[in-house]
């Protein structure tokens, strides 16, 4: 079952890739913008962490494909990125009840993007 994308997904993806400096966080490549993806450690259907910044990482197409197909490698990458405690905390947040506040998330992401753009 494919999860439908919406404007908040696009904003989240833009933030994650901007935060990474428009580079792949696994191999360091800088593909064009269409070749750089926002990968979710915990899949997008888990609404409680769908737009959680710890759940997103910027990957080139090749690394995205590789981690999607190699879950053990994805887990190892996730631990290197977040640390074991960060991974455990993210997993705990997947079990949160209720719907995320989409308006608040939108405001937060726009502010974070603005801060990143002002730093450059």
Regions found by a protein language model. Name each.
Residues 3, 7, 18, 65:
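A short glycine-/small-residue-rich loop at the edge of a beta-strand within enzyme catalytic domains
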Residues 8-37, 60:
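Short cysteine-rich loop/turn motifs with clustered Cys
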Residues 25-57, 67, 73:
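Histidine-centered nuclease catalytic patch
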Residues 66-73, 84-90:
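Substrate-binding/catalytic groove segments of enzymes
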